[in-house]
Amino acid sequence: MIRILLAEDDDAMRTYLARALENAGYEVVAVDRGTAAVPFLEEQHFDLLLSDIVMPEMDGIELAQICADIAPRTKVMFITGFAAVSMKASREAPGTKVLSKPFHLKDLVMEVERIFDDQWTARI
């Protein structure tokens, strides 16, 4: 089963995202900030880090950089409601996917599926 670490500081958004991903068959561990995600990255395996960019204590870009050091095989996908932040993420964390808010939950699930479809296709 594909494991996803979700870092999102908004309680309602975190709940909705986790539920949508779990309903799609993914195992989700959800935390409310980047600093809370780091110990999970250090201690467990995740296939995907799904992170908001703008969060207290540690933003999603910094979290993605730490993830690249700790767990380089973990894919990274950002979610954000700020276009300028999205552009910064694309510059500072190349190769990551950025999904801009607002989005439908089905769009999130489709993007996650696409990440792993591409991964499996590349192995064949």
Stretch-by-stretch model annotation:
Residues M55:
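Receiver (REC) domain active-site loop signature in two-component systems and cognate sites
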